[in-house]
Amino acid sequence: MRLSDFYTALRLALVLPFFALYHMSRWVVMYFPAANVGRVVSIASVLLFLFIACTDFLDGYYARKSGKYSSFGKVFDPFADVIANVTVMLCLVADNFMPVFLFLCILYREFGMMFLRMLACGEGHVVGAQRMGKLKTASYMGAVLFSLLLKALYAFELAGADWYERMRAVGRLVYVVPVVLALASFFSYLKTFFPILKRVCGRTRYPVCKTCREWD
């Protein structure tokens, strides 16, 4: 296994531990009401997320350093990004840090990208992450980190309740930026996939799809 693929696999492996850690405080309180683990959990969640974000940087760094880009890595890296980002955002939706509507916009965008990638693979093409896609992922991580740090500040009583609620409202607006970049990157990817869509939709076994032929 290449070192870049190892870091991608590590990122994927840390997703469920993050989910469990994020919800640990409420699970512990259910069985041990006197326990107060909120501070430990909040700071540990921030640190684990930062490590997950570092693996995203490291896999790209070592791939560029070695100059070796495998078809597997081109598919595996964006797949791990999707699983990690969607799982972390789901945690924040549960705590009302992220609006459900914005989460659904991102989720549907990722489903759309998965469909396009599968379609491309069926045609023998592997399309890796583009610069716009990486920018989108960076905006995901920035918005998530803002929410996690805000939660940690409140857990350590470094933020008052009024200020905390105001910043939570600001945090919800912050997620508009990742959604805009996600949609922009989706349309950017469509330009790459367009020749493949034309070829697939132009076949007689797909007679119902005329849209691509009409775009000639």
Curated annotation (Swiss-Prot):
<feature type="transmembrane region" description="Helical">
    <location>
        <begin position="176"/>
        <end position="196"/>
    </location>
</feature>
<dbReference type="InterPro" id="IPR050324">
    <property type="entry name" value="CDP-alcohol_PTase-I"/>
</dbReference>
<keyword id="KW-0444">Lipid biosynthesis</keyword>
<protein>
    <recommendedName>
        <fullName>CDP-diacylglycerol--glycerol-3-phosphate 3-phosphatidyltransferase</fullName>
        <ecNumber>2.7.8.5</ecNumber>
    </recommendedName>
</protein>
<keyword id="KW-0812">Transmembrane</keyword>
<keyword id="KW-0472">Membrane</keyword>
<feature type="transmembrane region" description="Helical">
    <location>
        <begin position="88"/>
        <end position="108"/>
    </location>
</feature>
<dbReference type="GO" id="GO:0006655">
    <property type="term" value="P:phosphatidylglycerol biosynthetic process"/>
</dbReference>
<feature type="transmembrane region" description="Helical">
    <location>
        <begin position="40"/>
        <end position="60"/>
    </location>
</feature>
<dbReference type="Pfam" id="PF01066">
    <property type="entry name" value="CDP-OH_P_transf"/>
</dbReference>
<comment type="function">
    <text>This protein catalyzes the committed step to the synthesis of the acidic phospholipids.</text>
</comment>
<keyword id="KW-1003">Cell membrane</keyword>
<dbReference type="InterPro" id="IPR043130">
    <property type="entry name" value="CDP-OH_PTrfase_TM_dom"/>
</dbReference>
<keyword id="KW-0443">Lipid metabolism</keyword>
<dbReference type="InterPro" id="IPR000462">
    <property type="entry name" value="CDP-OH_P_trans"/>
</dbReference>
<feature type="transmembrane region" description="Helical">
    <location>
        <begin position="141"/>
        <end position="161"/>
    </location>
</feature>
<keyword id="KW-0594">Phospholipid biosynthesis</keyword>
<dbReference type="GO" id="GO:0008444">
    <property type="term" value="F:CDP-diacylglycerol-glycerol-3-phosphate 3-phosphatidyltransferase activity"/>
</dbReference>
<dbReference type="InterPro" id="IPR004570">
    <property type="entry name" value="Phosphatidylglycerol_P_synth"/>
</dbReference>
<dbReference type="InterPro" id="IPR048254">
    <property type="entry name" value="CDP_ALCOHOL_P_TRANSF_CS"/>
</dbReference>
<keyword id="KW-1133">Transmembrane helix</keyword>
<comment type="similarity">
    <text>Belongs to the CDP-alcohol phosphatidyltransferase class-I family.</text>
</comment>
<keyword id="KW-1208">Phospholipid metabolism</keyword>
<dbReference type="GO" id="GO:0005886">
    <property type="term" value="C:plasma membrane"/>
</dbReference>
<comment type="pathway">
    <text>Phospholipid metabolism; phosphatidylglycerol biosynthesis; phosphatidylglycerol from CDP-diacylglycerol: step 1/2.</text>
</comment>
<keyword id="KW-0808">Transferase</keyword>
